[in-house]
């Protein structure tokens, strides 16, 4: 039997270099990915290396608040 409520949540990952560049107005946009994570296994904020089409390279994408 399953215990508790929803352990898996949908999160949004945002490019960290695009968000820093958007302050200086260098990048045309901000890359965002959606994924799911298990809150029990990864209680901290998730950071993954993903491809950013605005930076044209693989960068670190961090979890953001909704």
Swiss-Prot record:
Where's it mainly located? plastid
Q: Which Gene3D superfamilies match?
A: Ribosomal protein L33
- Cite the GO molecular-function annotations of the record: structural constituent of ribosome
Highest taxon of the lineage: Eukaryota
What keywords are assigned to this protein? Chloroplast, Plastid, Ribonucleoprotein, Ribosomal protein
Where it sits in the cell: the answer is: Plastid, Chloroplast
InterPro entries, sorted: Ribosomal_bL33, Ribosomal_bL33_CS, Ribosomal_bL33_sf, Ribosomal_zn-bd
GO CC, any one term: ribonucleoprotein complex
The record's listing under Pfam families reads:
Ribosomal_L33
One of the protein's GO biological processes: translation
User: What family does the database annotate?
Assistant: Belongs to the bacterial ribosomal protein bL33 family.
What is the name of the protein in this document? Large ribosomal subunit protein bL33c
Q: Which organism is it from?
A: Cryptomeria japonica (Japanese cedar)
């Amino acid at each position: 039997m399953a215990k508790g409520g929803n352990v898996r949540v949908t999160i949004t990952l945002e490019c960290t270099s695009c968000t820093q560049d958007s302050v200086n107005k260098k990048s045309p946009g901000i890359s965002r990915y959606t994924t799911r994570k298990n809150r029990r296994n990864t209680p901290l904020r998730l950071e993954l290396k993903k491809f950013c089409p605005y930076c044209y390279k693989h960068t670190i994408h961090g979890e953001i608040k909704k």
